[in-house]
Structures are given as structure tokens and as C-alpha cells.
């Protein structure tokens, strides 16, 4: 599996091509550790399968996903199927739904820092948002020309996905980014099992 194949099902949920392109670009640009690292470096948080370590094998770097990928898939599933229904947010525009899936896929993309470290870093949400703004400034600007709220949903959704548990303690200000925060919270609970 390559980087995009790992998230093939999740990328298919992004109905807007420009938002899917941004997400794919970010996945291709991410540190390799994102694809093979456990979701929790301490083992204190997340489900058992989210604490696994994956590998990159062979000359073609075939990916056997780690726990962070499993956690990310769980967040996407909750953000797409569960959390919007719980909060009566089924009336979102297609672009907003696509932005939520994009942010859900990318929310932990720099969880181990840039360059990667041994342990996760507390401010990884803010770091991921700044990283995406830096590497994809032109793509985010183009999205803003079509949909004024989409770049904010993506950037705030990534930056504030931890809410009060982040060092900044800043909570999401938009309903849409609150959905990402809720999905991440519930996906990280040890007692929750999400079918993939």
C-alpha cells in the first residue's frame, strides 16, 4: 500500500475534488512516521489497535499501517457517520463535509513533530495547521475563492482538534470544527470499538 492507498476509503468520502487534492498533497508531503507510528507514544491513551507500530517494507516503501493510521480512520468514520447525527448537523454543505473529512484525516499528521521525534508533542494540532498553511498556501487560497468557510474549517479543525486538552486550551469556535474535536475525543477512548 502507498500513502494514498492507506486512506483510499477516507479520501473517497471527500466529494469536492479541490479539497481531495489538498488532502492527497498533504499526505504525500507528510513525514513517513505518520503512517507507521502508534497513536499514543506512552500507551496511556487510545484503543489497543491504535497503539500498534507499523512498518515500511521493501524498496517501494510498502506501508503496513500503524496505530496512528487506525486512529485517524476512526476519527474520519465518526466525523462522517456518527458525530454529525448526534449534533443534528446533517444539513452541512458538501464542501463543509469535505473539509471536515480533510481535517479529520490531517488532524494528527505532525503528532510526532517536524522533524519527527520519539514521543508525541502536545501542540501537534497547532503545528499541523501551520505546516499545512506553509506547504499548501496556494491550494488553501484557491479553496477560499470558492468557499469562504472551507479553509477556516480545515485549519481550525486541525489546530483545535484537542480542545481543552491542548496546551493552548482553545476550544473550536465553529460548529463544524467542534465535530472534528468530538470525533477525535471519542475515537481516542479505550472503551470504544469502531468497526472499519
Task: Locate each region found by the language model.
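Acidic/His-rich, divalent-metal-binding segments that scaffold phosphate/diphosphate chemistry
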Residues: 1-116
